[in-house]
Amino acid sequence: MKWLKRLTVIVGTFYRYRLAGLCASLMGSGWICALLKMMPQSSKLKNEPPAVRLRLALESLGPIFIKFGQVLSTRPDLIPHDYAVELAKLQDKVPPFDARLSREQIEKSLGQSIEKLYAEFETEPIASASIAQVHKARLHSGERVAVKVLRPNLLPLIEQDLSLMRFGAAWVERLFSDGRRLKPLEVVAEFDKYLHDELDLMREAANAGQLGRNFHNSNMLIVPKVFYDYCTSDVLTIEWMDGTPVADIAKLKADGIDLHKLADYGVEIFFTQVFRDGFFHADMHPGNILVAADNRYIALDFGIVGTLTDYDKRYLAINFLAFFNRDYRRVATAHIESGWVPADTRAEELEAAVRAVCEPVFNKPISQISFGLVLMRLFEVSRRFNVEIQPQLVLLQKTLLNIEGLGRQLDPDLDLWKTAKPFLVKWMNGQVGPKALWRNLKNEAPDWAQIIPSLPRKISALIDENRQQEMRDAYIHLVKVQQRQSLWLAVIAVVLLLILLLK
């Protein structure tokens, strides 16, 4: 009955932070919403804005709900802007767990004692969060490493909270008129995947390895080496990196770091990941970035990454180029062509809505325009038009906001458009023309070589399948007709019988 106890805690928090009225206002109208507004509410925090009360409630419910709020903050297509801003303030910081448990977890996962695994191992963790904590160590070969270890017995607690979230999301969709638009089950499913990805440290090791290969010998970014022999799904051993936290501007200046070049590097690294690699570090907040003495960035924490298809890249390139040319008609048609917009959407209405939210942004000097803000405004319009925004693009928008904020902290005069435009134009030019056509033909040739010989057989099978389906449909239709006829015959027989009896 642990789930019942936990549910009681959640409902109590719901009352204590006056969230009944908030839910009613977010969910639209209907008798359920009216009932929620009539519920008695705690007098506590009555003067605080609803978004603040929601953040405080999630903080009080613990690490899993804090992470849920962080994920929700990246969905401006689903929640109002002020809620997204407030939930972004949630901090995932918890006290470290017992060092003895940490040692036991490492030894159990790697199958050897700490002494055999590491020449030195610092018992006191250097960082701690809700999912894992990090210890400093040294391998017997001499390399200094960071050892990340998952909190023990975490999975049952996560599954319990996720089950309750799924239960609540299902009822929200059933009971509230606006429930489907908010897509609660989709949000919880996305959060479920996000959490389970973070719980697999072998996946994080693979992410770090991929990013390291993409930026091998880069003059802009250092990615720590992964020691795969010391990694499992519960333990990650990665190269220890020395550097200055990127947010420590005073120290960077004192060390003679070129802040202007560093800001440009950040933007260039981001767009290289997006348009060259289609694979990007999606958690690039200042806490995960150091700066080396040679003016290069050092990336940390690879638990969250995003991947982009050529279709996603095309969507981004078309929209950014159209935005900065103020071609809002092209933005609208790009969304309709994507198939993410309801079929009955009128391009003129979408164009007018995009113009209304974006024109004020583009009234500023181009060096002051925020790419991340442009995407956020676009997602806000999407919410009104029920556009299906892809999760990887939401991750990208959050990452872009982080990169922009960081870049302008280093260099207030940073011109993102100047750095980004060559990437966009180069990528778009690479998608059209004879060279692009020849490249695509070469890429597709092996598939066509396999498909063409079997094409007649597959076409024949498809025709047969269609015929069989037509026969099945005809049979079902015939059965339904016979059932209706039988029903009417039975009704007529009953009516005739009643007439005879009444005589």
From Swiss-Prot:
The lineage of its organism: Bacteria, Pseudomonadati, Pseudomonadota, Betaproteobacteria, Neisseriales. Keywords: ATP-binding, Cell inner membrane, Cell membrane, Kinase, Membrane, Nucleotide-binding, Transferase, Transmembrane, Transmembrane helix, Ubiquinone biosynthesis. InterPro entries: ABC1_dom (IPR004147), Kinase-like_dom_sf (IPR011009), Prot_kinase_dom (IPR000719), UbiB (IPR010232), UbiB_bact (IPR045308), UbiB_kinase (IPR050154). CDD domains: UbiB. Is probably a protein kinase regulator of UbiI activity which is involved in aerobic coenzyme Q (ubiquinone) biosynthesis. Residues 120-491 form the Protein kinase domain. It is found in: Cell inner membrane. ATP binds at residues 126-134, 148. One of its GO terms (molecular function) is ATP binding. GO terms for cellular component: plasma membrane. This is Probable protein kinase UbiB. The active site is at residue 283. Belongs to the ABC1 family. UbiB subfamily. It is a multi-pass membrane protein. The keyword Metal-binding does not apply.
